[in-house]
Amino acid sequence: MEAAKGITLNLRELGCPGESIATMIHGPDPCYDAPDTQLSDAVTFLRVHHSAITLVTVDLGFNTLDVCLRHRDIDRTCVSPQLTLLRRQLTYVMRDLTRAAGPHVTFIGVGHYNPYLSFSTKEGSTETFAANSVAALRQMNRTLAEVYGSFKVPMADVATAFHEEDLRIVRRPHKEATTVNVLYECTLTWMCAPKPYGPNIHPSDAGYAVIAKAIAVLLPPNL
């Protein structure tokens, strides 16, 4: 998308699969050797490139909350404490990043889609789990937006980009009826894919493209 506008970006990927905010701050993780952490490398990068025009996307939070949603059940006593922890840890991360950033750095936070909506098509406990996950993910996105907003950082609305609130019924030939939001989830993630590819909570190529567009609408004119 940026290339189409004549803008050349050099990517520095600092993310690490399965990273929580806690492991980003303190380690350990499979991507960094102590004493380095993802956060320390990000701070160093920003200091070294202090005068550069830089875009930083921050995609954190889901793995901190997901400990409450494992085993296709929701531990309601877990959600509020984890969101309190998320708020405190993300504030710590954003404080370090913004202090290290130069005058030409743009930060964009990334909200999250709910990867469990497709379970609403199954009867029993998984259907209940899908319904209960909606409130938990909404709470998480509100918490993320509040923290990013306290640093004057916009947040890409990925949940809206994935049409999560669209509950209209879709009737398809030779297939069970479903809802628009579930249809989007099946297209934009691997949750409805057969083994060995799914079910997997991560985005498909189409999903990553939708997330990129949600970020792109927040970019300043120089990017």
How does the language model describe each region?
Residues 179-223:
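Histidine-centered active-site loop/cap adjacent to the catalytic His
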Residues 15-22, 60-67, 103, 112-118, ...:
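Solvent-exposed loop/turn segments at secondary-structure junctions
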Residues 1-88:
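Conserved SGNH/GDSL esterase-like catalytic core that processes O-acyl groups on lipids
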Residues 85-87, 117-160:
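Substrate-gating cap/lid alpha-helix
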Residues 166-183:
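Aromatic- and acidic-residue-enriched segments that line the glycan-binding/catalytic groove
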Residues 1-7, 89-108, 139-157, 218:
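A structural motif corresponding to the C-terminal end of an alpha-helix
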Residues 37, 41, 78-92, 96, ...:
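Extracytoplasmic/secreted proteins, especially bacterial periplasmic and envelope-associated proteins
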Residues 73-77, 122-129, 189-193:
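Short glycine/proline- and charge-enriched loop/turn segments
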